[in-house]
Amino acid sequence: MAVVADFNGDGHPDWVARNISTRQTVVVYLNDNLVVGAALAPTLPANLALIGAADFNLDIHPDYALFAPNTLQTVIGYLSGPTLIGAASGPTLPAGWELIATADFNGDNNPDFVIFKPSTRQTAVVFLNNNVVVGAALLPTLPAGWNLAGIADFNGDGPMDIVLFNSATRQTVIGYLSGAALIGAALGPTLPMNWQLVAAADFNGDGHPDYLLYRPDTRETAIWHLNNNVFVNSVFGLTLPSGWTVLSH
């Protein structure tokens, strides 16, 4: 997945590019698919993977959610724009689980952690107040061959929904949620060969989440504008320089 958030507060989602060898991150500021600027962001420690970005301390600036696979420790890196201003340990995950995303699932305006257990394909949400655990709930078990690719409110009912991607068939599916409970599903568009679905956010500001696509072999990005699960149109975005990726880890 890609790390997407509005880092400069202009109402448009931005995304984070990562240098695979140096672990430097850069925030790419966007207006829909158009690059309007960029800024150096923190270099990631060798033991930590960048998983997501959300405003954990409610200072209106998105923060980094980090995960150490070897220790199962989570860390929040507090940012002001692209600048690191502090950090705090989050929960240590149970054995066999990994942090895969962040989103507000219970509507309390505090971002939560989405965790995944590969051996059973179970997902769960860990409800947070900043870096402190206040509860947890099971999310849907993912079918074999499908992976979580994005979180957004696709049907406009308030609660977050999940979008899954099947890398073999290129098919996408939106799972509609009420809190943590699955209440329905709909097929989304099928992607072209060599492209991956890496995030969902409302890039064109029409009130409907869109797909962020990435092609690893050419490092191209594209945005597919959607109305719920229905494809509307597409635009190409930035092609990343050699050695950089939009994938979080």
Task: Enumerate the predicted regions with their spans.
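Trp/Gly-enriched beta-strand/coil motifs that build multi-repeat beta-propeller-like domains
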Residues: M1-H249
